[in-house]
Design a protein with these regions (language model features):
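Active-site core of metal-dependent hydrolases
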Residues: 127, 136-137, 144-221, 230-235
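N-terminal hydrophobic targeting/anchoring segments and the immediately downstream early-domain regions
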Residues: 1-152, 209-269
Length: 269
């Protein structure tokens, strides 16, 4: 069975720690992907708004690193810009790489910059990380407080600019990713858009009640829109333990997969 992984931070790890996409000590490299029979890997360019490097600059640096690493191995993997590219790569015996952004605010409140990210090959954007960002709000109100994992924001959704932002994403053909977004923001995306969207790395709140996961109703609404939820392998989002820092294990991942399957079917997980 071919693997589609909707989110990884490998490019950031290489940026911070050095190393190669071909082979490294992280969770994802090309050799591991080949062994796992990957079809598609989404590579997230994660930018922390509190970083010392300006967000717009950091995003550009990460995108440059992404292409430099991918283009070293044209016999193994190629970047994709459309669904047809995935099919063409598979027929050619190649894996596919999709460029994504994790932090929508790297556009500096300017939709012209959003359009330029599309021209650079970005095909999915996670609207927020763990801070309010001018586009919307996360469920977390304090990214450094473990207990805040259970907070759920049903009040603060997309801003006026955020509504313009998601509409422009749809027009361009950039997939909207609602992982990290507040509950109110999720329902705003549902209200102001018409195409399928995704939660690239979220789990079922019915099993693990943290705010990063989706409620049953959210999963059902996502499925009605023909969207997809990508299971998150982070232990704290797989199961709840009193002191946090839950260990990630395959049994817990399977529980979430089966939970979503029983709720809406396998086509949406």
């Amino acid at each position: 069975m071919k693997v589609v992984d909707m989110h990884c931070d490998t490019v950031l790890r290489i940026y911070d720690e050095g190393g190669s996409l071909l082979e490294n000590d992280f969770n994802i490299d090309l050799k591991k992907m080949l062994k796992g029979d990957y079809l598609l890997q989404n590579f997230a360019m994660f930018v922390n708004l509190n970083d010392s490097v300006a967000p717009l600059i950091k995003a550009q640096q990460l995108i440059d690193l992404y292409y430099n690493e991918i283009n070293k191995h044209p016999d193994i993997i190629k970047p994709i810009f459309s669904y047809q590219d995935i099919i063409d790569n598979q027929n050619a015996g190649l894996m596919s790489a999709m460029l994504t952004l994790e932090e929508g605010a790297v556009v500096n409140h300017d939709l012209a910059i959003l359009r330029n990210y599309y021209r650079l090959g970005v095909r999915m954007i996670t609207l927020t990380w763990n801070y309010p960002n001018g586009i919307g709000y996360p469920n977390l109100s304090n990214a450094n407080d473990h207990h805040d994992l259970f907070s759920i924001n049903t009040k603060d959704g997309l801003t006026d600019f955020g509504i313009e932002y998601v509409k422009e994403m749809e027009r361009l053909g950039i997939i909207i990713d609602v992982s990290h977004l507040s509950d109110a923001g999720f329902y705003d995306v549902l209200k102001y858009t018409t195409k399928p969207f995704v939660a690239s790395h979220s789990n079922a709140r019915g099993i693990c009640g943290v705010g990063r996961n989706l409620s049953d109703d959210m999963i059902k609404e996502l499925a009605k829109r023909n969207g997809v939820i990508g299971i998150n392998f982070c232990g704290d989002f797989l199961k709840t333990i009193p002191n946090g820092n839950a260990r990630s294990c395959i049994e817990d991942m399977v529980k979430h997969i089966l939970y979503v399957k029983n709720l809406v079917g396998m086509d949406n997980v």
